[in-house]
Amino acid sequence: VKNGPGGTMQLVGPDGLVTRKFSFTTLAEQKCLFDQTRVASATAQLSASGTVSSQTVRDLTPILICAVPKNTTRFLGATLPDDYLEKDLMTEDGVLEIDLSNGKVADRSPSVQEGVDAISIKATEEAIYFINRYNNKLYRLLRS
């Protein structure tokens, strides 16, 4: 993973070539989490007798979870990260889960009526947790 100016992130393969490029703006320290999650994958084996058996293997996969502001125009006149930390700037976020091994992006945004300004992101194999700065409540998003 390489970070670039202007909110760009590049996934780089073992050969040094860029495999996927993302562009989004967020406050990485407050709104992102690098995680490793266990992902199930099935393998099939053929026995000497000709029967096929399958086995589920759970591999560790590197994941980036970020709360991404839906509108960043308010960032233009802000002093970052100070205005954000002092709550002079609030955001309304979507939540993205990016599999860093293949670049697959899953939108995990909560379906709630009130705004979500997500901080303190944590994750388990089953769920993503965060605090909403608008109401100081803990939220849980199930991972499917």
Descriptions of predicted regions:
Residues 118-144:
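Blade-level signature of beta-propeller repeat domains, shared across WD40, Kelch, NHL, RCC1
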Residues 9-16, 85-102:
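Beta-propeller blade signature
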Residues 58-60, 67-90:
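Short, conserved, GDST-rich strand-edge loop motifs in beta-rich repeat architectures
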Residues 18-36, 100-124:
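Conserved blade-ending motifs and adjacent loop-strand segments that build the rim/top face
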Residues 39, 60-62, 125-127:
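Short coil/turn segments that connect the beta-strands within blades of beta-propeller domains
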Residues 1-2, 65-67, 129-133:
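Residue position within the beta-strands of beta-propeller blades
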Residues 3-6, 70-74, 135-138:
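Short glycine/acidic-enriched loop and turn motifs that connect beta-strands
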Residues 1-32, 36-45:
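Acidic, serine/threonine- and glycine-rich low-complexity intrinsically disordered segments
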